[in-house]
């Protein structure tokens, strides 16, 4: 039986964690990015389909390629973040299912239904983005996820000759707490949940 994590771990992962818009000038190493993926890849997906593909942008050149796709409110926070992750989904993720889900012919579930394939890829890559955020927090990093960008521009700039489509962006680094806004409220259990 699994044991609950400590209250301090829950604080790190959830209750004390914040979305950051300002960053300290502390780099995030490539080794740390590999550690992040080594954790997040274990999060569950439908039939283990694992459709997320991630591009970690660490260079000024990469940020300049991304700049035209950013909304004005997301520009400065992204250009100053040590890393910006493009979380994308592979529209042909099912080609890896013989390796990832060898228990049956799962590939045919999706080759016979392009709509199901797209819905599955988008939904599950979104879940994997959440796992990435939790992995960042677990390793002492802060994040700033964003959906305010021009997806077509990102796809043209980074994925033009591939089967990848962008889902969201996540800024990653060590946040500057002095630039945080006051904590915003969340919905109560009664407002957001039901019991049947």
From Swiss-Prot:
The keyword Transcription belongs to this UniProt entry's keyword annotation: no
Keyword Flavoprotein: yes
Upregulation: Up-regulated by the nitrogen regulatory protein C (NtrC also called GlnG) and repressed by RutR.
Alphabetical keyword list: Flavoprotein, FMN, NAD, NADP, Oxidoreductase
One Pfam family hit: Nitroreductase
Cofactor(s) needed by this chain: FMN
Catalyzed reactions per annotation: 3-hydroxypropanoate + NADP(+) = 3-oxopropanoate + NADPH + H(+)
Enzyme class, first EC level, given as a word: oxidoreductase
EC number: 1.1.1.298
GO molecular function list: 3-hydroxypropionate dehydrogenase (NADP+) activity
GO BP terms, alphabetized: nitrogen utilization; uracil catabolic process
Function recorded in the entry: May reduce toxic product malonic semialdehyde to 3-hydroxypropionic acid, which is excreted.
Protein name: Probable malonic semialdehyde reductase RutE
The organism's taxonomic lineage, starting at the top: Bacteria, Pseudomonadati, Pseudomonadota, Gammaproteobacteria, Enterobacterales
Gene that encodes it: rutE
């Amino acid at each position: 039986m699994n044991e609950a994590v400590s209250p301090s771990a829950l604080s790190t992962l959830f209750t004390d964690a914040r979305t950051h818009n300002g960053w300290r000038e502390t780099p995030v190493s490539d080794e740390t990015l590999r550690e992040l993926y080594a954790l997040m890849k274990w999060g569950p997906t439908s039939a283990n389909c694992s459709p997320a593909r991630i591009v970690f942008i660490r260079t000024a050149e990469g940020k300049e390629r991304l700049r035209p796709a950013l909304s004005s409110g997301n520009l400065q926070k992204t250009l100053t973040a040590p890393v910006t992750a493009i979380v994308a989904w592979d529209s042909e993720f099912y080609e890896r299912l013989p390796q990832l889900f060898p228990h049956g012919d799962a590939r045919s579930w999706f080759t016979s239904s392009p709509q199901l394939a797209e819905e599955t890829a988008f939904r599950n890559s979104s879940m994997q983005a959440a796992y990435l955020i939790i992995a960042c927090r677990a390793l002492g990093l802060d994040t700033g996820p964003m959906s305010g960008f021009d997806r077509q521009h990102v796809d043209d700039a980074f994925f033009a000759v591939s089967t990848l489509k962008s889902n969201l962006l996540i800024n990653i680094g060590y946040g500057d707490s002095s630039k945080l806004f006051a904590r915003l409220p969340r919905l109560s259990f009664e407002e957001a949940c039901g019991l049947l």
